[in-house]
UniProtKB/Swiss-Prot annotation:
Domain F-box: 6-54
CDD domains per the UniProt record, alphabetical: F-box_AtFBL13-like
Domain of life of the organism encoding this protein: Eukaryota
Pfam families: F-box, LRR_At5g56370
Protein name: Putative F-box protein At3g58860
PANTHER family (UniProt xref): RNI-LIKE SUPERFAMILY PROTEIN (PTHR31293:SF16)
Length: 457
């Protein structure tokens, strides 16, 4: 950088320079600060630090084993923290792997905690579990904590208390037995909780919080007995796990959007039939509902228990070819205010219980359920161009009286019939005819590279 440009940067207001330095990775910000004394001075007060050992290491060159590079990284962190002294800090991010000294990591974390850090992101992928320092669990300044990989909370005692914490993200974090039940009461203003790759240590879990608004759970642990949701102000729920033995409490009266992705094995089918309805009834006030293929199958096990989703305006259903649509007729019937329907695939297994939603089996009263459905927009995803799909599209156009818009998105990852020369043109002509015959507007979307490949055949 020439001296003229350097002078221009140096004339910027201090707060602008500080913002620029904060937005850079700390290693780059430190390198930049040697350009001028003013920048070097301001770097000492940068309120955001981001350390990643990959900035120093080059695994593709086989250098991770070189202790000198790891020492260089650790010394760099030490120097930066020493340079900043006791100046306030807002954000601290640390992402390290095996070879970094855990004791030094402890000191770095305690350093920023003492300086009033509010946003903390810690991801340690060590060979052995790393225990987060006790000091984190009693921080009076933390607003956001994100941590994961080889991390546990064994050092956190029953006196944990995080009075300012609003966002907590835990990914593959290990709890001690009974420890999770003390976590939420220790976070009185928590609004967002993400439990990713969760391993439940307790058989019976109660998620209880009056402040929580957003909750995401992903787990394939399969060891949970009962799971309760006592979260009356929850607005968003994304739940992915094996079906629990029971859902005794489901207090979700203010829920707006929910995604249910259940994992089901053969030995849990009866459990799902008997116990999952407490969960489904608990989410009946939602306005947006995302349903995975397995969840859709679970709904078909006991359709008569399905509640009325009186507030539901958007329904997103993903299905697979190996499943039937047994739950579809009653599900649509029980959504009296449905406006938008997303279908992740039209192809499914033909059964005598598909009802009259599809045209799989000829029926005298074909389309009756659709005629009572108020939906005005349908989006079809994963369209493969089969004749059966085209017939299904015509069926929806014929029997959905309120339908104003249909969007068809062509499959991009799996094989389709469009590989057959001229087939895309034939399907497009057919859909164009449907568009002219119907009051519904049909929009057809295909990626440009695929379109050119198929039309050139």
């Amino acid at each position: 950088m020439d001296s003229e440009k350097m002078d221009l940067f140096s004339k910027l207001p201090d707060e602008v320079i500080s913002h620029i330095l904060s937005s850079l990775p700390t290693k780059e910000a430190a390198s930049t600060s040697v350009l001028a004394k003013k920048w070097r001075y301001l770097f000492a007060f940068v309120p955001s630090l981001d350390f990643n050992d990959s900035d120093f290491l080059h695994p593709q060159e086989g250098k991770r084993e070189k202790d000198g590079i790891l020492r260089s990284f650790m010394d760099f962190v030490d120097r930066v923290l020493a340079l900043q002294g006791a100046s306030p800090i807002k954000k601290f991010s640390l992402n390290v792997k095996t070879g970094v000294d855990p004791d030094r990591v402890d000191r770095w974390i305690c350093n920023v905690l003492q300086r009033g850090v509010s946003h903390l992101a810690l991801f340690m992928d060590f060979e052995e579990e790393y225990s987060l320092p006790y000091e984190i669990s009693v921080s009076k300044t933390l607003v956001e904590l994100k941590t994961g990989y080889g991390v546990d909370l064994y050092l956190w005692d029953d006196d944990m208390f995080l009075p300012m914490l609003k966002t907590l993200v835990l990914e593959s974090v290990e709890f001690g037995r009974g420890q999770f039940q003390t976590l939420l009461p220790a976070c009185p203003v928590l609004e967002e909780l993400m439990l990713l790759n969760m391993e439940w240590k307790d058989r019976n879990v109660i998620l209880s919080s009056s402040s929580l608004k957003n909750l995401k759970i992903t787990s394939e642990d399969g060891c949970l007995g009962t799971l309760s949701f006592d979260t009356p102000n929850l607005v968003f729920l994304d739940y992915y796990d094996y079906v629990a033995e029971d859902y005794p409490i489901v207090n979700l009266k203010n829920l707006v959007e929910v995604g249910i992705n259940l994992v089901l094995t053969a030995d849990r089918i009866n459990r799902a039939r008997d116990n999952v309805w407490n969960l489904i009834h608990g989410i009946q006030n939602a306005e947006i509902f995302h349903i995975s293929p397995v969840t859709f199958e679970v709904l078909s096990l006991s359709c008569e228990a399905m509640p009325v989703f009186k507030n539901l305006t958007t329904l997103n259903i993903r299905t697979v070819m190996q499943q039937g649509w047994q739950a579809m007729p009653l599900l649509l019937k029980n959504c009296p205010n449905l406006e938008t329907l997303y279908l992740g695939g039209l192809l499914h297994t033909v059964t005598n219980k598909c009802g009259d939603v599809c045209d799989c089996i000829p029926r005298k009263k074909k389309g009756r359920s659709l005629m009572a459905c108020p939906v005005n927009k349908i989006q079809i995803q994963g369209f493969r161009g089969t004749i059966r799909e085209v017939h299904m599209i015509k069926h929806f156009l014929d029997f959905c009286p309120s339908l104003k818009e249909m969007e068809i998105i062509v499959e991009t990852k799996e094989p389709t019939l469009f590989e057959i020369p001229k087939w895309l043109e034939i399907v497009e002509d057919t859909l164009m005819q449907y568009n002219e015959m119907s009051s519904c507007t049909i929009n057809y979307r295909v990626l440009a590279p695929l379109y050119w490949r198929w039309t050139r055949k």
